[in-house]
């Protein structure tokens, strides 16, 4: 089984358990802390990826690092993935968990690049329009793209909506040269 499929399955199982137990917020917080700690610690990354370190040793080490900080369900999850020799996929499982949680709550992440900084009112209108378009709640990441001549580009999952001036000029060029 590929690591992506396994990560998604483990993440889905953890989310199911968290929802059934009513501890989704606590598990969210736990996973954020685990993710940040692993990202900041080269030693933890090496330990998690090492095939020479046994699963129960990895579980004990993680429990020692996060002693008294994690919810019981999160601790059981860590123990499970260590015993199943999947601890090296923990960062991917955290990302899959976040994606599944957002999906289940009807939230979608959108990347908006603009040539100039959008005013607050413009950003609100754009987010409201995207929410109407997608039928979901929108979490927008706004960024400046100095390569754009003007306008905006919006990335929703695998879909790109290109409202940039460059794109409009390219479309105009194609239309004008098609008639010749």
Curated annotation (Swiss-Prot):
SUPFAM superfamilies reported for this sequence = N-terminal domain of the delta subunit of the F1F0-ATP synthase (SSF47928)
MF annotations from Gene Ontology? proton-transporting ATP synthase activity, rotational mechanism
- The main location class comes to membrane
Q: What are the cysteine partners in each disulfide bond? A: none
Task: Tell me which InterPro entries the record gives.
Answer: ATP_synth_OSCP/delta_N_sf, ATPase_OSCP/dsu
Q: Membrane topology type, per the record?
A: Peripheral membrane protein
One Pfam family hit? OSCP
Assembly description = F-type ATPases have 2 components, F(1) - the catalytic core - and F(0) - the membrane proton channel. F(1) has five subunits: alpha(3), beta(3), gamma(1), delta(1), epsilon(1). F(0) has three main subunits: a(1), b(2) and c(10-14). The alpha and beta chains form an alternating ring which encloses part of the gamma chain. F(1) is attached to F(0) by a central stalk formed by the gamma and epsilon chains, while a peripheral stalk is formed by the delta and b chains.
Give the family, as the similarity comment puts it.
Belongs to the ATPase delta chain family.
| Descriptive protein name | ATP synthase subunit delta
User: Which source organism?
Assistant: Prosthecochloris aestuarii (strain DSM 271 / SK 413)
